Amino acid sequence: MAKFYGIGVGPGDSELVTIKASRLLEDLDILYTPEAKKGSKSFALGIAEPYLKEHLEIKQRHFPMVRSNSTKEVQWQAISAEIAEDVRSGKNVGFITLGDPMVYSTYSYLLALLEKEIDCQTIPGITSFCSMASELGQPLTMDEESLAVMPATASAEKIEAALELHDSIVIMKVANHLDTVLPLLEKLGLLQQTFMVSNSSMDKQQTLLGLEGITPETKLPYFTTFLVKKKIF
């Protein structure tokens, strides 16, 4: 029976794709890949390429990166309808996403539209912040410590509350939001407790502990994450 698979391809290194994900990628009839900018190559596709069969049908679809949900919903509905049609025609269809499909992924919106229409299965992947923690040798949590994962697009109030309440705080995709995040870290005395990792697990990975040299005007790679550790291991 044909099925729709949401497949996490991990943080960037193709060798961090799970065995199950690699096997399913090899067996797909159609692969959908997300495209943030029209005409740009999907980064997730680059990670998955070593596992794709030669004549696989690839459908790269644009997902607008805008705040308006109404604008995004039009595209979600159109793409989910196309996926459903492919599955009903007997094709095994995949949608790949960076990291894990259930962590800040467009896939979640497609799943909500499709799970009552067709057979769906979600294949987990390694998140960027779990990869970061391993590379840094820093446990995300120990004993009774708490962990928060926040998008840098959240309000200053939400980010500050997380920084005050939790022991470890991940702030994702900070590159375009330094003017919000840096003042909060400085206010709470956490600049020296913050690890910065750009392009985790990729060839151009950059790592830094302490943000005194970073300003709101600093140009950082798009895939830059802060890990705030109140107790550095």
Segments (PLM) and residue ranges:
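Class I S-adenosyl-L-methionine
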Residues: 1-14, 19-21, 26-118, 207-208, ...
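A contiguous loop/helix-start segment that scaffolds small-molecule binding in enzyme catalytic cores
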Residues: 4, 163-233
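General beta-strand structural signal in soluble alpha/beta enzymes
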Residues: 33, 60, 95-97, 122-125, ...
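Class I SAM-dependent methyltransferase SAM-binding "motif I" and its flanking Rossmann-like core
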Residues: 102-165, 231-232
